[in-house]
């Protein structure tokens, strides 16, 4: 006998790729490996990635999150300290060395590439224009690679219009890795209109994961009654995905950290849901949200595959002799 359901039908357009990128995987793995090799506590300067679920999971394993190296107690000065995936100014490792601290730099290799691009511009005599968001840890880290005054932050096309450089013919730009691809292109166009000699970095600064996730959302947003992005409010790449969904045609687009944040009373009647996750959001939260909708709807999953990601960034040599258990790997990969 066929069973019937009184639940309304709902198609979930599930983006792939979504969630953790290679840089996030690597950063989380570094903290877990350090805990297994050296024991707790392992100190982490700033949130290793911008996601509370991940941070709280690492805290439960013995990680201690700090904002300044001066917060490390004297009795734990031999404990490892990990720098977050967003990168740090040059002054931070210098401070760690001055304090005789053992540090592990979990800066995403693609962020490190931007640092090198900025330094190359300076070596070639160019003033560096950094396209990014003021106050973001990645921007602070990139600006801190060069002497004060060597970098100018450009956040908007209006900033580009106001810019008065000392030498308009000696400019080079780099970008934060997690920006809106479309917004960044507009800022670069505005800069080039005013400064035709503006030099680009040797390679694209916006990372593959940012681009892939934005393209996936753009492809799946048209006609969606609601689009949910799993991510934290302080996650730049997650907030950009919300904006992309709105621009691409989703009726409503929201950022949520957990299923408990879904505003059921505001959703109304929906038949199509778009779903993706920022690069620092674990897959287990995506599963949690799908389960929450299954409780209220007769769900059909429409998997929208727009790219295949094979990138893998190895950890530093000092941690490669440590083996992770299947449970460790599940956490590192966002599945637990």
From Swiss-Prot:
CDD domains reported in the protein's UniProt record: lytB_ispH
Pathway membership: Isoprenoid biosynthesis; dimethylallyl diphosphate biosynthesis; dimethylallyl diphosphate from (2E)-4-hydroxy-3-methylbutenyl diphosphate: step 1/1; Isoprenoid biosynthesis; isopentenyl diphosphate biosynthesis via DXP pathway; isopentenyl diphosphate from 1-deoxy-D-xylulose 5-phosphate: step 6/6
MF (Gene Ontology): 4 iron, 4 sulfur cluster binding; 4-hydroxy-3-methylbut-2-enyl diphosphate reductase activity; metal ion binding
Catalytic activity of the protein: isopentenyl diphosphate + 2 oxidized [2Fe-2S]-[ferredoxin] + H2O = (2E)-4-hydroxy-3-methylbut-2-enyl diphosphate + 2 reduced [2Fe-2S]-[ferredoxin] + 2 H(+); dimethylallyl diphosphate + 2 oxidized [2Fe-2S]-[ferredoxin] + H2O = (2E)-4-hydroxy-3-methylbut-2-enyl diphosphate + 2 reduced [2Fe-2S]-[ferredoxin] + 2 H(+)
Pfam family, one: LYTB
Binding site for [4Fe-4S] cluster: 21, 108, 207
UniProt: dimethylallyl diphosphate binding residues: 50, 86, 136, 235-237, 280
EC number: 1.17.7.4
Cofactor (UniProt): [4Fe-4S] cluster
Residues binding (2E)-4-hydroxy-3-methylbut-2-enyl diphosphate, per UniProt: 50, 86, 136, 177, 235-237, 280
Keywords, sorted A to Z: 4Fe-4S, Iron, Iron-sulfur, Isoprene biosynthesis, Metal-binding, Oxidoreductase
Enzyme class: oxidoreductase
GO terms, biological process: dimethylallyl diphosphate biosynthetic process; isopentenyl diphosphate biosynthetic process, methylerythritol 4-phosphate pathway; terpenoid biosynthetic process
Binding of isopentenyl diphosphate, residues: 50, 86, 136, 235-237, 280
Active-site residue list: 138 (proton donor)
Entry's cofactor comment: Binds 1 [4Fe-4S] cluster per subunit.
Function: Catalyzes the conversion of 1-hydroxy-2-methyl-2-(E)-butenyl 4-diphosphate (HMBPP) into a mixture of isopentenyl diphosphate (IPP) and dimethylallyl diphosphate (DMAPP). Acts in the terminal step of the DOXP/MEP pathway for isoprenoid precursor biosynthesis.
Family assignment from sequence similarity: Belongs to the IspH family.
Entry protein name: 4-hydroxy-3-methylbut-2-enyl diphosphate reductase
Organism expressing this protein natively: Mesorhizobium japonicum (strain LMG 29417 / CECT 9101 / MAFF 303099) (Mesorhizobium loti (strain MAFF 303099))
């Amino acid at each position: 006998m066929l069973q019937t359901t009184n639940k309304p039908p709902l198609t979930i357009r599930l983006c792939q790729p979504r969630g953790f990128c290679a840089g996030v995987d690597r950063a989380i793995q570094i903290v877990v490996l350090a805990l297994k090799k050296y024991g707790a506590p392992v100190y982490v300067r700033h949130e290793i990635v911008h996601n509370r679920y991940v941070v709280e999971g690492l805290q439960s394993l013995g990680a201690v999150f700090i904002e300044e190296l001066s917060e490390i107690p004297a009795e734990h000065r031999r404990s490892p300290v990990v720098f977050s995936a967003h990168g740090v100014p040059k002054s931070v490792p210098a401070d760690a060395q001055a304090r005789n601290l053992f540090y592990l730099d979990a800066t995403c290799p693609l962020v490190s590439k931007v640092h090198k691009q900025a330094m190359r511009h300076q070596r070639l005599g160019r003033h560096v224009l950094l396209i990014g968001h003021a106050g973001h840890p990645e921007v602070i880290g990139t600006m801190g690679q060069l002497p004060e005054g060597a970098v100018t932050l450009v956040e908007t096309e209006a900033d580009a219009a106001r810019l008065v450089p000392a030498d308009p013919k000696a400019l080079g730009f780099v970008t934060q890795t997690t920006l809106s691809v479309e917004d960044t292109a507009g800022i670069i166009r505005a800069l080039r209109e005013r400064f035709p000699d503006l030099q680009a970095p040797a390679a694209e600064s916006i990372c593959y994961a940012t681009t892939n996730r934005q393209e996936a959302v753009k492809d799946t947003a048209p006609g969606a009654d609601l689009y949910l992005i799993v991510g934290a409010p302080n996650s730049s790449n997650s907030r950009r995905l919300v904006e992309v969904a709105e621009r691409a045609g989703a009726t409503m687009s929201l950022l949520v950290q957990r299923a408990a944040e879904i505003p059921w009373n505001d959703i109304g009647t929906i038949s199509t849901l778009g779903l993706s996750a920022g690069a620092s959001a674990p897959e287990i939260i995506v599963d949690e949200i799908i389960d929450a909708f299954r409780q209220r709807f007769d769900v059909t999953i429409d998997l929208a595959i727009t790219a295949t990601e094979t990138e893998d960034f190895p950890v530093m040599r000092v941690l490669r002799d440590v083996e992770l258990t299947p449970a460790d790997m599940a956490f590192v990969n966002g599945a637990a």
